A protein has these predicted regions:
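Iron-sulfur cluster-binding cysteine motifs and their immediate structural context
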Residues: 1-16, 221-222
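Cysteine-centered iron-sulfur cluster-binding motifs in ferredoxin-type domains/subunits
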Residues: 1-7, 38, 113, 204-211
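Extended interfacial segments that mediate partner engagement and assembly in macromolecular machines
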Residues: 14-41
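Low-complexity, highly charged intrinsically disordered N-terminal segments
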Residues: 35, 40-62
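Long, compositionally biased charged/polar accessory segments in the mid-to-C-terminal portions
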Residues: 50-53, 155-369
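Glycine-rich phosphate-binding "P-loop"
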Residues: 64-94
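Short, charged, surface-exposed secondary-structure boundary motifs
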Residues: 66, 139-148
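A short alpha->loop->secondary-structure connector
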Residues: 123-135
Length: 369
């Protein structure tokens, strides 16, 4: 507990006015294998060129997620792609410190709180370390994901992909590969219970609310994520295969990012930081709100199957316990559900895109059965 950033934040000299870029990798195959614009793999490539190690979140055989270090570019598929659940850190901080003390270059990626934790553990800055923090929405307990899988598929899932691009970058599709060889594609919030409650923060852990690490200055040398909303600013580019936002939070991060050659991008453009629209909340430290359905869901999921717990939590009777002073009523009628819902959004924390996500979640919830 001596180095837990929740008790002792590490010193932070990063800028509050960082340079921001919209980028797309030129390698079509790499882009296909990446959740957004492929920049994480391009940064990792520079680390491997220095005989360095790369740290990040990887799937385990039991479909839990853990942080690992890899030493070969051929192992990058383990670290690519979004994982919308908490990763097990184990002794990864100690592993990183050992590599650094041995003189090896390390590129380490994680949620902002994980980067702050690593920096607190190390106690000082290492010139041979580059940290990447992610534009993170929230990080639900891994137990929720395990329950969702077990209730929906038993032990038949061989692999799971949160951000399948079969229908495009912004399709929000999940791909579930069963041990029988069957592949199931679900269109995110509209067809999948887990995606629905992830994106409207019904699973948001209490410690993710008002996250102190998701603000400027950031704790990582570099911040990366999806550049949602960029098509409205620069409609002349093709974003169907994904685009990344890159924020260089200090000179070291900028210098490392600049090592990637222009030829490795089809798009690399410096843009105003305020252009970060759909992910802009992750720079403000105030958008990790708790869904008004969270307490009901936490209660129901203890005894009910996952999808049914979501349905019960979203039922109209659960809305009565929400303090009216926090609510902004929005009438929504769904022919599918067959009755009128009163949807409520957090007036100060919920933007229009998240309102649409909540509506999509509620209108399609009965498709899961």
């Amino acid at each position: 507990m001596k180095v837990c950033p929740s008790y002792r934040l590490p010193s932070n000299v990063n800028t509050t006015t960082p340079n921001c870029y919209a980028v797309i990798a030129s390698d079509a195959e790499l882009l296909k294998k990446s959740s957004s614009g492929g920049v994480f793999s391009l940064l990792a490539k520079k680390a491997f060129e220095q005989q360095g190690a790369v740290g990040g979140a990887a799937w385990k055989e039991d479909l839990s997620v853990e942080h690992i270090l890899i030493d070969q570019e051929s192992d990058m598929p383990k670290l690519r792609k979004s994982k919308y659940l908490q990763s097990y850190l184990g002794n990864i901080d100690a592993q990183v410190k050992k590599r650094l003390q041995q003189g090896q270059f390390v590129l380490f990626s994680g949620c902002p709180c994980q980067i702050a934790g690593l920096r607190a553990y190390l106690g000082k800055d290492y010139e041979n370390l580059i940290t990447i923090d992610l534009l993170c929405g929230n990080s639900p307990s891994a137990g929720f994901f395990q329950k969702y899988l077990q209730d929906a598929f038993g032990d038949q899932v061989a692999s799971y992909e949160f951000r399948n691009k079969a229908q495009g970058w912004n399709s929000d599709c999940v791909s579930i590969q069963l041990k029988s060889g069957e592949q199931i594609i679900r269109r995110g919030k509209a067809e999948d219970a887990y995606q629905s409650v992830y994106h409207n923060h019904t699973m948001c852990p209490p410690h993710c609310q008002n996250c102190k690490y998701q603000q400027l200055p950031r704790f990582g040398d570099i911040t990366i994520g999806d550049f949602w909303g960029i098509s409205k600013r620069m409609p002349e580019f093709d974003y169907t295969k994904g685009v990344s936002v890159v924020i260089c939070n200090n000179e070291k991060g900028q210098a490392f990012f600049d090592q990637i050659s222009e030829q490795e991008f089809t798009l690399k453009k410096e843009v105003p930081l305020k252009w970060i629209g759909g992910n802009g909340y992750a720079l403000e430290g105030k958008h990790n709100y708790a869904s008004p359905y969270r307490d009901a869901f936490f209660d129901k999921v203890r005894t009910e199957p996952f999808a049914k717990a979501v349905k019960l939590a979203f039922d109209q009777q659960n809305l009565g316990a929400i303090p009216s002073e926090f609510l902004n009523p929005l009438q929504f009628h769904s022919q599918q559900i067959g009755f009128q819902y009163d949807l409520y959004t957090w007036e100060q924390h919920l933007d229009s895109s998240m309102t649409r996500a909540t509506i999509a979640s509620l209108s399609s919830i009965y498709n899961w059965f």
